[in-house]
Amino acid sequence: MGLKPDKWIREKSLNEAMITPFCEGLVGEGVVSYGLSSYGYDIRVSDEFKIFTNINAEVVDPKDFNENNVVDFKGDICIVPPNSFALARTVEYFRMPKDTLAICLGKSTYARCGIIVNVTPFEPGFEGHITIEISNTTPLPAKIYANEGIAQVLFLEGDEQCETTYSDRKGKYQSQTGITLPRILKQQ
């Protein structure tokens, strides 16, 4: 399994629409950087957010998530409250090759401010926007800048193609657009 370089990422994105829209260079002046880097791609956070609230004083249950636990926000700057959490999505839409897994890591610019980004791996055959989990670990409000970098994606090509892709098994987040809240498949 090998880490893929900029040339491979560019070719897959331009010829097979792996990343749409695709930024061929690294944009970094006056913004949190985004675009193609040496061995990865820095994704942007869109201007759509879901910010957690405790107005209803409910327990967060991943098996029975209540949409009233979040407040929708759209704007150029999202303020995540102290010790709180927000969901967002990427500007980019991904179409993962059947022999490639992607791992996403938060940007150090945000991490150095106490803002932690989590994204689960992009599995082979996955397609859709990426839902981003943002934690403000500080006792202060934190700014997230829409349409700027939020995390870096690293692409790992397998030595051989997997038997069953995310698409083949009809993954519950396949073809997601916008911010997708937790889903649990119901037993038949």
From Swiss-Prot:
Q: What class of enzyme is it?
A: hydrolase
Listed GO MF terms: dCTP deaminase activity; nucleotide binding
Active-site positions, per UniProt? E133 (proton donor/acceptor)
Name the EC number(s). 3.5.4.13
Q: Which UniProt keywords apply?
A: Hydrolase, Nucleotide metabolism, Nucleotide-binding
The organism's superkingdom is given as Bacteria
Extract the Pfam families matched here: DCD
What does the entry list as the binding residues for dCTP?
Answer: K107, S108, T109, Y110, A111, R112, Q152, Y166, Q176
- Per the UniProt entry, what is one GO biological process? nucleobase-containing small molecule interconversion
Gene3D superfamilies reported in the protein's UniProt record: 2.70.40.10
Involved pathway(s): Pyrimidine metabolism; dUMP biosynthesis; dUMP from dCTP (dUTP route): step 1/2
Q: Which reaction does it catalyse?
A: dCTP + H2O + H(+) = dUTP + NH4(+)
Q: What does this protein do, in the record's words?
A: Catalyzes the deamination of dCTP to dUTP.
Would you identify the family this protein belongs to, as annotated?
Belongs to the dCTP deaminase family.
Cite the record's note on assembly.
Homotrimer.
Q: What is this protein called?
A: dCTP deaminase
